[in-house]
């Protein structure tokens, strides 16, 4: 019986939410292990649409335990707002089915303000963050001045911790020409929220260890994508956390041996939000058409996603850096009807052919894709639930992707609906 880690194999927005929800039916526990409320996902269940940002997908399934791990940065107000919205849709959320790591780092309003100030000041050099305070919160965590959930349980020592945090942030704000923050206001806000947050607090590493020893199935839910990893992504156009599969262990307090099967999610084409290199980007009518068909707009921000052909070089690289055992290929139906589709099989960099994305920012911007043209298919793949329902040419496309990235397709998604999924290999039984 394997635990399963789900990671994005591209730049995020690959359809992880649907796949995690589909897998969560077989899991006992669903765990978020990195990121914050900057990476939203949409789930469609029985015709009802749910939009999640911070909460694990497991909250939508009765009898499942959802967990937010220590690797997440946690915005208390965003959490309370999301819980209220889901409860309004009839979703039961309480400490009975949701636990939050007591040592999770909190995102405060000052983090959001700093994030926005930096992005706006950078102008053309902006990274393209969601301005939700994710990066500044991780900075405070590494700088050992962050406020953590457990700190709200001791209001006697909390003022000292707030003062230590503000010694840093007020110095920054003075330099940016912004008014200083009053420690009393932060203390009042956190004190007011504490009774609503602390009932969820848990020693998550211990909880998960106990559950694992009991034989419970654990599903680790990654946010964003491996190409946004702060170390292995397209730096500096990345997020502020590690998004590769190994973070599932660090971000929950479980040992690497508990991780198990790694499932990488990727679209049948490529998208990216925000700035940064994108070798296969299509700025023509085809790119626009893919975006229209795929409804490529951010769940949280509404930002338009950049679209391009499938990049086998990048996905192959992610397969290696994440140790991916199988892929879940999504949105194959978006390519229905094209006369032909292109797949990037390599790059040219300064006249030389290479089979990987270099780490340097300048080199990443200069690489040129080498394409292989594959015949398209006219018959629809949408809503298919078996290989027999797929056009022969669509199957050839999937098989070619497997060859190029060196990894089998374990799941194939043909619509946003949970049931429209073709299972090749069950990750929990691999």
Swiss-Prot record:
GO terms for molecular function: adenylosuccinate synthase activity; GTP binding; magnesium ion binding. GO terms for cellular component: cytoplasm. The active site is at residues 13, 41. Pfam families: Adenylsucc_synt (PF00709). It is found in: Cytoplasm. Binds 1 Mg(2+) ion per subunit. Its EC number is 6.3.4.4. It comes from the Bacteria. Pathway: Purine metabolism; AMP biosynthesis via de novo pathway; AMP from IMP: step 1/2. IMP binds at residues 13-16, 38-41, 130, 144, 224, 239, 303. Coiled coil: none annotated. One of its GO terms (biological process) is IMP metabolic process. Keywords: Cytoplasm, GTP-binding, Ligase, Magnesium, Metal-binding, Nucleotide-binding, Purine biosynthesis. Belongs to the adenylosuccinate synthetase family. Homodimer. This is Adenylosuccinate synthetase. It comes from Rhodopseudomonas palustris (strain TIE-1). The lineage of its organism: Bacteria, Pseudomonadati, Pseudomonadota, Alphaproteobacteria, Hyphomicrobiales.
């Amino acid at each position: 019986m394997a635990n399963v880690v789900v990671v994005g194999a591209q730049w995020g927005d690959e359809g992880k939410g649907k796949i995690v929800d589909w897998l969560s039916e077989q899991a006992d526990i669903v765990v978020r292990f990195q990121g914050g409320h900057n990476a939203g996902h949409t789930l469609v269940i029985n015709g009802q649409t749910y939009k999640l940002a911070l909460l694990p997908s497991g909250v939508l399934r009765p009898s499942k335990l959802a967990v937010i791990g220590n690797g997440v940065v946690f915005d208390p107000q965003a959490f309370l707002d999301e819980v209220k919205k889901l409860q309004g849709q009839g979703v039961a959320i309480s400490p009975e089915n949701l636990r939050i790591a007591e040592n999770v780092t909190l995102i405060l309003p000052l983090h959001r303000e700093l994030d926005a100030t930096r992005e706006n000041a950078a102008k053309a050099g902006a990274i393209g963050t969601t301005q939700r305070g994710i990066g500044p919160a991780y900075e405070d965590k590494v700088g050992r001045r962050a406020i953590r959930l457990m700190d709200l349980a001791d209001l006697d020592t909390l003022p000292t911790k707030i003062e230590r945090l503000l010694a840093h942030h007020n110095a920054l704000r003075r330099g940016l020409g912004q008014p200083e923050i009053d420690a009393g206001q932060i203390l009042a806000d956190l004190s007011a929220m504490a009774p609503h947050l602390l009932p969820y607090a848990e020693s998550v590493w211990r909880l998960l260890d106990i559950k694992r020893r009991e034989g419970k199935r654990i599903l680790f839910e990654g946010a964003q994508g491996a190409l946004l990893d702060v170390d292995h992504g397209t730096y500096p156009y990345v997020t502020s956390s590690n998004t590769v599969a190994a973070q599932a262990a660090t971000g929950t307090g479980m040992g690497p041996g508990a991780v198990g099967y790694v499932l990488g999610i990727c679209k049948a084409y490529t998208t990216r939000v925000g700035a940064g290199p994108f070798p296969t980007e299509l700025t023509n009518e085809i790119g626009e058409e893919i975006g229209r068909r795929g409804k490529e707009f951010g769940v949280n921000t509404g930002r338009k996603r950049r679209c391009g052909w499938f990049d086998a070089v990048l996905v192959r690289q992610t397969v290696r850096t994440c140790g991916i055992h199988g892929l879940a290929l999504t949105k194959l139906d978006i390519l229905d009807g094209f006369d032909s589709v292109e797949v990037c099989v390599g790059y040219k960099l300064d006249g030389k052919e290479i089979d990987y994305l270099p780490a340097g920012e300048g080199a990443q911007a200069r690489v040129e894709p080498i394409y292989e043209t594959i015949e398209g298919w006219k018959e629809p793949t949408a809503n298919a639930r078996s290989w027999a329902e797929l056009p022969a040419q669509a199957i050839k496309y999937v098989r070619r992707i497997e060859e190029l990235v060196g990894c089998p397709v374990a799941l194939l998604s043909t619509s946003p609906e949970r049931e429209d999924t073709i299972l090749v290999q069950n990750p929990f039984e691999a």
